[in-house]
Design a protein with these regions (language model features):
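Switch/communication elements of ASCE P-loop NTPase nucleotide-binding domains
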Residues: 81-174
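Phosphate-coordinating catalytic segments in nucleotide- and nucleic-acid-processing enzymes
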Residues: 1-105, 109, 117
């Protein structure tokens, strides 16, 4: 089941298997696919950089229990920056400063790519609520394409916006 993405993004909240696949390395296959998806979506992001921070980089007061330190480090060890181009120069922007739609694309895109790679079902409530209709259609179209969906993954979603199905993009594959 998909977890809604709001104003913040917590990659560990995506779900452990998806986030572990993304975060095990900035060279992982799913991270490369996610970078391509963000580029194709044309949200102004030129590249994505991830940096892993070690436990030693976090300075905790002595009174903070070890269990809380580990939990904090696990939740904050990855720093994600979206790289934009401005006047030919790279301009990194922290993920928390990105738009809700870009955060949604990063989080939902990871889930979509994970289920496309594994096969199975992705269920989402109000999948299109935090994103532009064209971006929503792009994510859904990945399920109707045999190249991007060779394992016949399925998408089940709810929406109150009937306009997203007006162009026939949601037909059965055959």
């Amino acid at each position: 089941m998909a977890i809604p993405i709001g104003e913040t993004i917590n990659l560990k909240a995506i779900n452990d298997s998806v986030s572990d696949n993304i975060l095990k390395s900035d060279k992982s296959e799913i991270f490369g696919q996610l970078k391509r998806l963000v580029h194709i979506a044309d949200v102004g992001v030129h590249d994505i950089h991830m940096q892993e921070h070690t436990e030693e980089e976090f300075k905790f007061p002595d009174f903070v229990p070890e269990s809380q330190r580990k939990q904090f480090v696990q939740a904050h060890k990855w720093e994600v920056k979206m790289i934009h181009k401005s006047n030919g120069k790279d301009f990194p922007l922290d993920m928390d400063l990105e738009s809700t739609g870009t955060k949604y694309l990063f989080g939902m895109g990871a889930r979509v790519l994970d289920v496309l790679n594994r096969g199975g079902l992705l269920a989402c409530d109000e999948m299109n609520i935090a994103t532009h209709s064209e971006l929503f259609k792009l994510l859904v179209s990945l399920f109707n394409n045999t190249r991007s969906n060779p394992k016949n993954a399925q998408l089940l979603f709810t929406t109150h916006d009937a306009s997203v199905i007006a162009d026939g993009a949601f037909r059965a594959r055959g």
